[in-house]
């Protein structure tokens, strides 16, 4: 078993690093700022990919792949875009032993290289919409990195769509941010707040950015997904026009949207504990571990354990047996708790005689007795569903407990380390920047979730907590990853 994990209350950041490495999810590489995603971590990403990919295809999207290298002239075509990304870019200046005629940027995001192609593919309204997604790696030269959360190279998906009208583009933006919200809540068991970013926080080159924000156990916010309305900015930069039904030549409307492997970091920080990883069953590659208690006639116990695993796998439950004799049952219990296996079955000679076994839940540690009969798969499925639901409800309860409405700047400063703060803002970049400078808190989201808007009166006018000027709405402030 791995070394002891630092307790969350002792050092939350160290707890996170210890857990990621001890559970063999990821490790540091010899390339500064880059990480190695180990098999346990990559298995989670594959589960995420499979679920998201199915959701993308169900909404009419198809996958493609575009080059890793982007000509410098492309990057410079969209002024806001290059201003936002230039400091983070890695640039290739030489190839084949010679200096390149034009520098190539290693993909920080793909809007420019994709829109250079869309210009060639789009002539008429009949060519629209284009609904393409790409699974890829990107590079952003980060100064301060943290496994999964912020690394120089990371994996993600990026959707890039082209539309005939502004209305269609906005519908796409909202469709995809709601796909992300559904994925976060139904698969990750992660409650999120959906809404719009401020002008200063939006994506470089976007007209507006929509996002989902989640609360981690240290009460900081984590941006879990974004969807951008790019307007006609990239179409104009690349002169991408089409002939409308009326025969007019018009610029195309665009969107882009993406999530990345930082979702694995969100998963860890939202649910895990001092014993290790806690995974929602829908994203667990291995859902059930069966541990034989090897006393007396061990062959009969092992045979029964393997039979149970085979039956569960046949019914769509990912089960496996650890019948190795190199480690004690207690060691195995701790090891699989560390790895986040949702359910543990303990099986000994007496259990076989009574046709029962003990099931332990990873989320609560609660144990129960299950019947070893034809209903076993149903019993396990009920447990898995209960764990999935409990993780969501637990995270939601935590967020609600640590979301506070404040009406003054002194109250704001006194509580900014305690979670999400709901407060009036005057809508100016200046006030937003001053609050960030003084408290390190940012406006995470202008919520659009009806329940939250109603609960906190988000759309009610008031007075800005910082400037004292009139405010048309409340927003959510927090410190963030």
From Swiss-Prot:
Gene3D superfamilies: Anticodon-binding domain (3.40.50.800), Bira Bifunctional Protein, Domain 2 (3.30.930.10), C-terminal domain of ProRS (3.30.110.30). InterPro entries: aa-tRNA-synt_IIb, aa-tRNA-synth_II, aa-tRNA-synth_II/BPL/LPL, Anticodon-bd, Anticodon-bd_dom_sf, Pro-tRNA-ligase_IIa, Pro-tRNA-ligase_IIa_arc-type, Pro-tRNA_ligase_II_C. It catalyses: tRNA(Pro) + L-proline + ATP = L-prolyl-tRNA(Pro) + AMP + diphosphate. It is found in: Cytoplasm. PROSITE patterns: AA_TRNA_LIGASE_II. The keyword Nucleotide-binding applies. Pfam families: HGTP_anticodon (PF03129), ProRS-C_1 (PF09180), tRNA-synt_2b (PF00587). Its EC number is 6.1.1.15. Keywords: Aminoacyl-tRNA synthetase, ATP-binding, Cytoplasm, Ligase, Nucleotide-binding, Protein biosynthesis. One of its GO terms (molecular function) is ATP binding. GO terms for biological process: prolyl-tRNA aminoacylation. GO terms for cellular component: aminoacyl-tRNA synthetase multienzyme complex; cytoplasm. It comes from the Bacteria. Homodimer. Catalyzes the attachment of proline to tRNA(Pro) in a two-step reaction: proline is first activated by ATP to form Pro-AMP and then transferred to the acceptor end of tRNA(Pro). Belongs to the class-II aminoacyl-tRNA synthetase family. ProS type 3 subfamily. Consists of three domains: the N-terminal catalytic domain, the anticodon-binding domain and the C-terminal extension. This is Proline--tRNA ligase. The lineage of its organism: Bacteria, Pseudomonadati, Chlorobiota, Chlorobiia, Chlorobiales. The gene is proS.
